[in-house]
Every structure is written in C-alpha cells, then in structure tokens.
C-alpha cells in the first residue's frame, strides 16, 4: 500500500491539456451521463448549476439524480448488483461491491492540484476517488454573550487558547451573563476525534497485525471530555439523550458550539436574536480539525470518458471556484480566490484552520480509503467511539474501561485480507 506524500500549496500544477481528458469541443454533443448524488438542493444547487453550464458549453447533458441520503448507499449497491450503476457519483464511502468498477482519477487530481494529503492510492497505484469538497470541524461563539461578559476569543493564530483556557473562558461568560451552558458539542465521533487530535492523539490506529491501538494522549482527551459533561459546562443530555445542540446554541443560551463548517449557512439564515461568530478552535498541544466531505467517482463503462471529461472540466480553477461559491464549499484545491459573500470571514477562518492543522486532520478520510483498498472492512455501522463516549458522558464508566471497550469492538469488527 502506497501513501501519497503531502505537498505544499505551491506545488506545480500541470497544464490543462496534459492528461488528455478534454475532447475537441462539441464532439460529445447530444450525449447524456447519469450523475447520482445526495443533498445538492440543500447545498445551493451547485452541481446542478454546473451541469447546466456544461450543457451550454458542450451539448453534453449531465443528468443529476439527487437521492435522499438515507437511501443513497442502498440504491448504489442495488444498482451495482443489477449492472445499472450511474456514470459518475458523489458518494460518502467506497463500497467493496463496486470498488473495482472505478476509473482512475489520479490524472484529474494531479492536473488541478487537489491536496495530496487527501488522496489515497489503491494497490495498482490508482486514485479511484477524491473529495469534491471539504467539511471541517470548527467552533462558534455567541459573540453577544462574550461581549456582554467582556471576555475575548481568538481571531488570529497568535492568540490561540488551549482547551483549559477555552473552558475557563466559557465558564466566565456563563457566570457573567446567566447563560444556561458554556458549551455544546455535536454527539458525533467525528467531532470527538477532532478534540483528541487537538490533545496530540492520533486516535485509534489499525496496525499491520490487524489490531487497534491508541496512545496516552487519547486518555487525556477522553478524561477531559468526561469532565466537561457535567450539566454545567456541557449538558449531558446532548450526548446521552439526543438533545439537539444546534437548537440549544440558536436559543442564545449557550456560549459556544463545537460543530463544523456546514452550520454557516443555517446560522446566517436563522439566527437573528444575537450575534454569532466563527472562532479558532482550542489547541491543547497542536492545531487540528477533522476533515470530511463527499467523494467523486466515475464508473467504468461506455460513458466513462464523457464522465471523466465533465469531472476534469468541473475542477478547472474557474468552474471549481464557481461551485464553491454557489454551494459554500471549502475547496480541496488550495490557492483559489473564493468569494463567500457575507460568510467570507467564517470561511476564511476555516481555510486558515485547515492550512494550519496537523496532517492527522485528514487521517479519518484517508484511512477509510486505504482500508477499503487494502481489503480491510470495519463491518456494519458500529461506532464504538461514540457508544463508549456516551457512557463516559453519563458517568457509567471510567476512561480506561471506555478505551478497552472501543479497542475490543474495533478488533472484533475488522476484517483483513
């Protein structure tokens, strides 16, 4: 298994025609390719807008099927079994059932400067998928409450707070303003991994012996997480009972919210009773986030080249910048000048946070790809990190027990060829 090296933002980008994806103009007139995805309408319709633009320029129809998220993976799996896969798709994970039917997108990724830290090669040295966009864990503050309390929050890297300093700050805000809670955090292992990374942990790592291990920093992070789930700093009900942290923050009674970039549009549209702001996340020992997003894949078949042409066109600087602006995407290509309008400050902060974060921040996505390419599957939908964290939040067990249970569950469910 090869891992692609991390390159700097200034790495060379090949000329547009170097990989030979684009045809000679109208050669594809009248053709149609099927593109399956989920959530485009809820993200501003960027893919549909680009499909319309592509038709105007080339005469090729990109027929988008926006499938409900809960049905998407099943639809793809059924299509693979019935030999009815679309020509391309934006997926959340790579399914071994159709993994061997993917075209190599390495040329597209290289030509347009997709961040190499996000790429993973299969056993043949190919890149069957790469992220179309990034989501990133991030922090929001109730600016009104912070200002009322006279407490500052960092807006530049030279003023970063640690987790200890951050919790002290939200306690001060809570005491000065009568806010209900200092912090809410999405009940998600994705968010919890980010906190672990910020404590210096690499999380739970699968070794060559097909067994998981972790590090001492994970213990420190989980001890800290347990300590702030005290119904004072954080409400236990979010992790234990499923209370909505988004709604709690939007109530105006919480000083800060540990969530992610996908909240920006919602807050812009739906928070009117107080001022909110994106803030730099705490860094206990290092700066880190946790990256996610949707993967672009092209399936082998009669329309594969036409689909590749569209993907290559989509990731040219002009077109990719346009879809990022329409859909509010954090780009997977560095160095673009994306205009986010009223949300510019928030997205600038997210991009700065990503650029400054340790490489471990992309480990979850990259590792998931490497595992499936290597024939290692986690099995089922189990999420032991979240399950055991719920017990921690509720005071049902200590951290050593939680870690032992997480590793036991991960080991039990992993399959290695």
Language-model-derived ranges and their functions:
Residues 91-138, 164-167, 195, 358-359:
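Hinge/lid segment of periplasmic solute-binding proteins
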Residues 170-171, 208-238:
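Glycine-centered hinge/linker elements that transmit conformational signals in sensory
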Residues 106-118, 155-159, 181-182, 201-220, ...:
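Short, solvent-exposed loop/beta-turn-alpha elements that line the ligand-binding surface or hinge
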Residues 4-96, 110, 303-306, 318, ...:
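Conserved N-terminal structural module of periplasmic/extracytoplasmic solute-binding proteins
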Residues 126-132, 137, 164-211, 217-218, ...:
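Extracytoplasmic/periplasmic solute-binding protein
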Residues 57, 230-231, 269-331:
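Extracytoplasmic/periplasmic substrate-recognition and gating elements
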């Amino acid at each position: 298994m090869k891992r692609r090296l991390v390159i700097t933002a200034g790495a060379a980008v090949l000329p547009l025609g170097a990989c030979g994806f684009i045809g000679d103009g109208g050669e594809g007139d009248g053709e149609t390719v099927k593109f399956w995805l989920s959530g485009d309408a809820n993200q501003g319709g960027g893919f549909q807008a680009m499909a319309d633009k592509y038709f105007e320029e080339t005469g090729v129809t990109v027929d988008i099927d926006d499938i409900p998220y809960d049905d998407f993976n099943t639809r793809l799996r059924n299509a693979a079994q019935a030999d009815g896969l679309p020509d391309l798709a934006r997926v959340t994970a790579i399914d071994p059932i159709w993994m061997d039917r993917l075209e190599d997108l390495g040329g597209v990724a290289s030509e347009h400067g997709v961040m190499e830290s996000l790429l993973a090669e299969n056993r043949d040295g190919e890149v069957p998928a790469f992220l179309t966009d990034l989501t990133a864990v991030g922090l929001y503050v109730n600016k009104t409450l912070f200002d009322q309390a006279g407490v500052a929050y960092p807006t530049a890297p030279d003023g970063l707070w640690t987790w200890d300093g951050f919790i002290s700050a939200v306690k001060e805000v809570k005491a000065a303003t009568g806010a209900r809670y200092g912090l809410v955090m999405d009940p998600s292992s994705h968010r919890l991994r980010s906190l672990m990374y910020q404590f210096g942990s690499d999380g739970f790592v699968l070794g060559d012996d097909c067994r998981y291990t972790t590090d001492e920093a994970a213990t420190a992070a989980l001890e800290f997480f347990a300590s702030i789930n005290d119904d004072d700093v954080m409400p236990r009900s979010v992790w234990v009972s499923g209370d909505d942290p988004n709604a709690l923050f939007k109530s105006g009674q919480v000083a800060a919210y540990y969530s992610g970039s996908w909240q920006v549009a919602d807050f812009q549209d739906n928070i009117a009773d107080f001022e909110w702001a994106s803030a730099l996340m705490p860094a206990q020992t290092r700066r880190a986030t946790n990256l996610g997003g949707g993967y672009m894949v092209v399936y082998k078949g009669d329309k594969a080249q036409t689909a590749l042409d569209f993907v290559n066109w989509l990731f040219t600087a002009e077109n990719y910048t346009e879809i990022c602006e329409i859909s509010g995407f954090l780009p997977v290509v560095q160095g673009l000048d994306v205009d986010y309008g009223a949300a510019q400050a928030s997205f600038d902060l997210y991009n700065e946070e990503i650029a400054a974060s340790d490489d471990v921040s992309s480990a979850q996505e990259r590792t998931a790809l490497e595992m499936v390419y290597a024939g290692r599957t986690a099995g089922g939908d189990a999420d032991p990190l979240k399950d055991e964290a719920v017990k921690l939040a509720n005071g049902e067990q200590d951290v050593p027990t939680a870690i032992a249970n997480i590793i036991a569950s991960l080991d039990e469910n992993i399959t290695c060829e």
